[in-house]
Amino acid sequence: MKHFFRLPTAFRPISRVSLRYSSTDTAQPKISKLKISFNKISESNSEKKDNLGSIDTRNCLSTQQDDKLSSTEPSKASLPPSLQYVRDLMDLYKDHVVLTQMGSFYELYFEQAIRYAPELNISLTNRAYSHGKVPFAGFPVHQLSRHLKMLVNNCGYSVTIAEQFKKKDVADNEANKFYRRVTRIVTPGTFIDEAFENLRENTYLLNIEFPENCMSQVADTSLKVGICWCDVSTGEIFVQQVYLRDLVSAITRIQPKEILLDERLLEFHIESGTWYPELVELKKFFIKYQKMPSQHRTIESFYGLFNLGGKEATERQLKIQFQTFTQKELAALRNTLIYVSNHLPDFSINFQIPQRQLATAIMQIDSRTSTALELHSTVRDNNKKGSLLSSIRRTVTPSGTRLLSQWLSGPSLDLKEIKKRQKIVAFFKDNRDITETLRTMLKKVNDLSRILQKFSFGRGEALELIQMARSLEVSREIRKYLLNNTSLMKATLKSQITQLTESLNFEKNLIDDILKFLNEEELAKSQDAKQNADVTRMLDIDVKDKKESNKDEIFELRDFIVNPSFNTKLRKLHDTYQGVWQKKTEYNALLKGFFVGDLGAKTFTLKERQNGEYALHVTGTASSLKKIDELISKSTEYHGSCFHILQKSSQTRWLSHKIWTDLGHELELLNLKIRNEEANIIDLFKRKFIDRSNEVRQVATTLGYLDTLSSFAVLANERNLVCPKVDESNKLEVVNGRHLMVEEGLSARSLETFTANNCELAKDNLWVITGPNMGGKSTFLRQNAIIVILAQIGCFVPCSKARVGIVDKLFSRVGSADDLYNEMSTFMVEMIETSFILQGATERSLAILDEIGRGTSGKEGISIAYATLKYLLENNQCRTLFATHFGQELKQIIDNKCSKGMSEKVKFYQSGITDLGGNNFCYNHKLKPGICTKSDAIRVAELAGFPMEALKEAREILG
């Protein structure tokens, strides 16, 4: 993930006041007063910002660009009101890209147009005004999402969006009919457009609340830190209090798209690792420094951001929940809620009840371990394909995939929950027909959480109401299906399934009403037409190239999306519409008989033209059209009104007639009234789901849970996985363990089968693994760590038999170090990472270490390796796998220096090489007791293509 560093910005720049400013008003924009108050609020911090080098984006331009700008830009006092508004926004949001809607375009102005137009690959030009030229660039409104991705995800900018709105009770032909206001500020953590498209991942925004003035003291690993993270696109929100030593593990588990920090921390550069080395991991993330809100704002003032089934119920549940939070958790929660509401001022936020996560309930996996084990992406190319998540994913719903990712990042420490998952997986594994039927049903389910959030935001198509209803209907069917098969379950599992599926019993009446009163077929057609139009716009097809005749539509009976029987008002509107339509039909028949039958025209059609005129379209021969012209020239009345020529050609006539004009306008007005009433009904249905947010989310959670566990059953059958025994012991016993991803890679390339190995660890013994280069030592270390993770998420594991005592923390020092510690040697980085293990591992932890001490001289490296091994065994007493090339040396030191008791606790195992005769050999990855005496480095060099002369020299030196 790209790190982007932000300079401080005032936390509440604009959301308290709705910015409204007409593009043609001559008065000074209202933003000016707001800006003054903003400066007063920020006055105490202004000197600090200057000292820290606060950057105005205008100063980022080249000298040549500055010269160009200064020579063409009008003075601020002479700017037209619309541009004055843009300039004031740019001054207020100095570190943001400002996109302002002007008609059907979003536009950039002044120095921002010069800077960002090339990055967006859009044309840069100048617009002339009475006092000079202004640089500007823009793109169509429908391309907003595409350009936001470029600005936010690719370039790492924050984007302020000012949308255009029509004033109420203002005629369309008035000049000052529009005003603009900031509707949202887009950052990686509030980029809802991207989140709604990327269904498989969470878009988490994380706030970290450090104790006041803690940076001025030496870092204390037992320092308590409050964190809050949320996904605005799903409504999930969590809080947790962690110790400083566990903070980075929590960040790694959450995988936030954006991290929010107090601007007061900026001067300490905490991501440099100077104050606390492990915080160097923050460099991997998008960091936003913000002026935090006043502590005087109570947490109760945020109740409006939640909907738990009515105002009273919401307040009651939140009060109970908030009482369980610590002060640091509440502070982090408050900061997060203000940030979200400030960045989405035009959106109705709808969070679920905040969930408190406990460090004692989740396995801690730091970022180095997550990377080394390739949990979410591969080390080599940072690709998701080939990762553990990719290898085990068999989920069929977006919510199931997100849940699987969350579980991999933070396996459970709750033995009861793990065993519950195992029982459900075992049932699905043994009953394949039931599993396949369940998964077929799950495939019909849409992403309920995100559809619900769309409704809350005032977004979401009417078709998504159908999708919501169908999904909830399927959830009821799933519940019924599983309950009908409980006879195959044991009593405990039967009770668990019954309790689990209770939430799937969503209110049937609401589902039935939506499916009864909404026209699903018409909605699907409308959606297809909209998507085709979007594709056309994306391809920049110029509709002006279409023929004129294609612009003018035959006036046909409209297909409406709500059943007229929904209410009396809609029924009456439809009855009136049908009555007018009948008149139109009769009128059309009369005119067709007149023009075609009496005057000899070829065709006659009633149409609505592109310009809104209701016209008669007649085609015919020259003689028949001449008759029509003569009739019109005589002002002959037809049913009390004359015909008038609107447009003519050699073969056509466009005519107007009062009756059709009146009928057309009446039909259009009725159509508009029906559409408005339908929109009200659609909003009513959306509101009913919003009012049942808690129930909808419970359904989504349960469906994701069932999807994930049933996917484990499918995986177990595919990959020959077994149910591990998970308990409270300190054991790790694996028989014929395998590495899932390596095994999958070998199988895909039709290479040799994977060599399985045993492992037996406890707190009072430690395995030292030796072997040649490429002998499989690192693979063995990783596979056992992965088996532990799989076991504690409730998945079956790749082996013949396994016993896993609950692991609270998983540590690794495997592979090359990340390039995060500037100006530090590889060995120094390895020592820092090893020290984290020695300081953090408990007797319930698992540590895998590879080649400790390799980055320095042989003697010193051996001493470091021995000291690490001894400390882990005697002090940490954690389960440890220790791979090294110093096997003989360590064995000798242990025998000479340590007691017999310690000597017996260290077990040495080796892999090796099998000679096949001549210069041929193969690796033997099967571990056996003993110490590998040589690493066969020369053979590896030979495989790598070393020149023969160099190989000969190496063999001679080796003797």
UniProtKB/Swiss-Prot annotation:
KW Kinase (keyword) present: no
Matching PROSITE patterns: DNA_MISMATCH_REPAIR_2
GO biological process terms on file: DNA repair; mismatch repair; mitochondrial DNA repair; mitochondrial genome maintenance; mitochondrion organization
Transcription regulation listed as a keyword: no
Top-level lineage group: Eukaryota
Comment field (misc): Present with 1670 molecules/cell in log phase SD medium.
Quaternary structure (record): Homodimer.
Similarity comment: family membership: Belongs to the DNA mismatch repair MutS family.
Name by which UniProt lists this protein: DNA mismatch repair protein MSH1, mitochondrial
Organism of origin: Saccharomyces cerevisiae (strain ATCC 204508 / S288c) (Baker's yeast)
